[in-house]
Amino acid sequence: MLILTRRVGETLMIGDDVTVTVLGVKGNQVRIGVNAPKDVSVHREEIYERIKKEQQAGPEHDSD
C-alpha cells in the first residue's frame, strides 16, 4: 500500500485520468473529491461490496 500525506487543497493523480483532492479535514473525517471519467466507477467501499454481493447473488427468480 502506498501511503501519502496531503494537505487540504492538495491533489494526487491515479493514472492520467483520475484525481483525488483533499477538500477538508474535520476531526477524524476527511472529505475528498474524486474526478474520474464516466466509464470509471467510484464508490465507497461498503457500497462497492454491496454491489458485488448483489451481482454474485444473481437475479432472483419468482416461483409462480
From Swiss-Prot:
Where is this chain's protein located in or outside the cell?
Cytoplasm
- The signal peptide here is none
A cellular component term (GO) from this record? cytosol
Entry keyword annotation includes Repressor: yes
On the tree of life, the source organism's domain of life is: Bacteria
What are the recorded Gene Ontology BP terms?
A: mRNA catabolic process; negative regulation of translational initiation; positive regulation of translational initiation; regulation of carbohydrate metabolic process
Function per UniProt: A key translational regulator that binds mRNA to regulate translation initiation and/or mRNA stability. Mediates global changes in gene expression, shifting from rapid growth to stress survival by linking envelope stress, the stringent response and the catabolite repression systems. Usually binds in the 5'-UTR; binding at or near the Shine-Dalgarno sequence prevents ribosome-binding, repressing translation, binding elsewhere in the 5'-UTR can activate translation and/or stabilize the mRNA. Its function is antagonized by small RNA(s).
According to its UniProt record, which protein family does this protein belong to? Belongs to the CsrA/RsmA family.
Q: How does it assemble?
A: Homodimer; the beta-strands of each monomer intercalate to form a hydrophobic core, while the alpha-helices form wings that extend away from the core.
Name of the featured protein: Translational regulator CsrA
Task: Give the species this sequence originates from.
Answer: Methylococcus capsulatus (strain ATCC 33009 / NCIMB 11132 / Bath)
| Gene of this entry | csrA
